[in-house]
Amino acid sequence: MGFLKAYEVTLLLFGLSETLVVVFYVVRSQPKTISVEFYDWFIAIVGSCAPLFLRPAEWGVFPMAKYAIIAGAVFQIFSIFSLNRSFALVAANRTIKTQGMYSFIRHPLYASYCLVYFGYIMSNTTIENVAVYAISMLFLYLRIIKEEKHLALDPLYRQYQLKVRYRLVPFII
């Protein structure tokens, strides 16, 4: 059921945010460096595809979690515009981003994914969705580690890590 039948703003915002991901991926700038390690590519592909296995459910632990999806989608939109043409699937250094959402946390786009997926499984709760969420979060964590390892080869990124200490949630992680 689409937005026009359900009149759900969550579907509209999620569709908009994912469309922006595709647009910025297509118009991304050329990387200065890009990881050529098989493991990095494997993590990026599995991590990107795993959420595609989330499925709607008849029941949710917390149906009002759709507001987490809305917040996550809005956060994702701001993060994508902050990242702009530096969008990548695999660890790559296009430009070290330090402005916008990146002035608060180092991985705002990943943080938005966590929030959207969490909201989704809380409002569409099944064992399968929880398993997909767990796998997605594991691969997202691995992506962060591999991406930061690659970006830390750039002295500007190491300075940025000292300035912006938190990866996903300010003052926590």
Regions found by a protein language model. Name each.
Residues 94-112:
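Solvent-exposed interhelical
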Residues 1-90, 119-173:
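Membrane-anchoring alpha-helices and their flanking helix-loop junctions
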